[in-house]
Amino acid sequence: MLDCKEAYELICKAIDRKVKFNELETIFGQNKTDIKNDNEKTKKVKQEDNYIDIKRFAANFYKTPIVNYKGYINGSKNLYSEIIAKTLVSEDFVKEWGKLKPVRPNHFDTGHNHSESVDINKLQISNRKEEILAKLLFYQRGVKDLGYIFDYQTPLKAVKSDSYGKIDLLGYNSKDKCYSIIELKYRPSGSEETLLRCVLEAYSYYKLFGLNQIESDQDHNGITELRALKDYKHTKNAELVILFDEKSCIVDDGGAETNLMLRIVPKDASNPHYPTKTVESQQYKECKELIDSSKHKELQTLCEEILAQEPHLKQIRFVVLRADTDSKSSYPTNIKGWSRKLDRLYRAETLLTIPSKG
């Protein structure tokens, strides 16, 4: 049976790193000195304790600082992320994700509506630009080469104290006839999260999401509009999509045309702003390496293992999001103050698809 503490310590040992003080407690909700009781009175209690450990480990592992480590382990030619991915597979830890179960009775009680009235200036007063971008993609509905977006910030918690996050975007891929669990990564200064973290986060959310609720829901605006599409058909199949920016550019590098957002300063949302230097996102860097070299072969193997143990997971897609400055489509009419000079429509480009072999 899985022991969360022992599993995490083993992974840390593999990358030559000590578990930091209070890390187990703050990330997994488990004290470092906790000892599993081998004298449980009933098998049922043991099973319940084991499931608690599974939830602690699998649902929260993507939050650990080690999955975002970049570069090489001291004194070796091995990337941190590669050794972590390899250990998850070789020690069968990846199988623990397969045991996660949804806990929220209704994911679609948020009232999200494609046509809700929005003021672009009020929307942009927040520094949480990734969430704002998710909303803008939701309001756009169809994103070329990504799919039809029917919800954003989909909640997974059953109660407030649950540690689970929210799915950035839910989409429908009409080409491959599957739902898309979309993990969006964006920062105006360039996102620094590793692909390992992105994949584990997306997979955790997939397991904690009750996909059958899409079919049973009767009230959610996005699902109602999805059902009206001529190429839509309900399915049990899904894909994981890692969606990211290529780079954030200064003006001289074409930022006015290519940056995903220009209203990046909340106190001056009526004017365009740019980063102080052009920065390529970590996801784009690693995706190029995944395609062009064997630098991330253990990540590839981890993705293949995830797909092998999930019969309804068709593929994992790595997708770059782009500003569609040539689009002739009309802007979302529900967004007051939307400007072609300052705001964007979006398109996507799939860089890599890892398919299920099943």
Name what the model sees in each region.
Residues 1-358:
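Charged, terminal alpha-helix-loop-beta segments
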